[in-house]
Every structure is written in C-alpha cells, then in structure tokens.
Amino acid sequence: MFLGYSDCVDPGLAVYRVSRSRLKLVLSFVWLVGLRLHDCAAFESCCYDITEAESNKAISRDKAAFTSSVSTRTPSLAIAPPPDRSMLLSREEELVPWSRLIITKQFYGGLIFHTTWVTGFVLLGLLTLFASLFRVPQSICRFCIDRLRDIARPLKYRYQRLVATV
C-alpha cells in the first residue's frame, strides 16, 4: 500500500493514498502560495538593488529639486530637506560601506525569507504524511470514544442502581 504505484500519482512512487482531486487541490494551493512568496521575495530583492553611486545621484537630484522648489515657494510651505545618510545609520552600520550593507541585507533577508517558507512547507508535508500514515484522525476519535465509554459505563450502572432502589 505504501511503497509502489498508486492511483493518485501517475508516474512514480506513492507514499500514501489520497484522492486525485484532493491531491490536485493541495498541490495547486502550495504552488500558488510558493509563487506568491517568490514574487514578493523577488520584489524585495529588486528594491535593495541600489549601488552607492545610484543612491548618491538620487540624493543629489533630490537636493537640487528641493533647492529649486524652495526659491519659488514661501518658507511656510517648504518641505524639509531629506536627512543626511549618516544620521539614518546606526553605529555598527556606519562602519560598513553603504553598498556592502545593502548586499548583506538583501542576501540575509532573502535567505531567511526563503528558508522560512520552505521549512514551513516541508513541515506541513511531513505532518500530512504522518497523519495519513498513522490514521491520526481516526485514532483520535477512537481514543475519545473509548474514554467517553469508560466514563459513561460506571455512571450508567450507578443510574441503573439508583432507579432500581427507588
């Protein structure tokens, strides 16, 4: 039953039997969630792909736009200039060059993100496998029914004795 061809998987070995529709539903759900997570991770990594020169160009462009707009507006409507980059960094981040910091954040952020969702799907798959292998839902229900029966049996006899004495 567990090692060999199954009707739920066409070309290959089946670990446990599930209906074809349920298998397709679970696989499509896992595929869609994985695709969505991959898109989010790709988007985040694109956001971090900025070199030091590009960020300096953007800052100088913003400063130039700010100085040109300040002269045409009244001081009460002027927007404050962007803060200096050194003010935004913590003490440890100041020691690391800006481009290396971005690459490090991108690498470890992506690594942690992908590791988390891959580990989650592997654990979900193992949980499903062992639940079906050991028939966990049926055994839990059987255990509960047996415990309830053990509790109800003495109560039933007490009730019968009480009714018989009255």
Curated annotation (Swiss-Prot):
One of its GO terms (cellular component) is host cell cytoplasm. It is found in: Host cytoplasm. Its main location: host cell. Keywords: Host cytoplasm, Host-virus interaction. It comes from the Viruses. InterPro entries: Herpes_UL5. Interacts with host IQGAP1. May play a role in rearrangement of cellular cytoskeleton towards an efficient viral assembly and spreading. Belongs to the RL11 family. This is Protein UL5. The lineage of its organism: Viruses, Duplodnaviria, Heunggongvirae, Peploviricota, Herviviricetes. The gene is UL5.
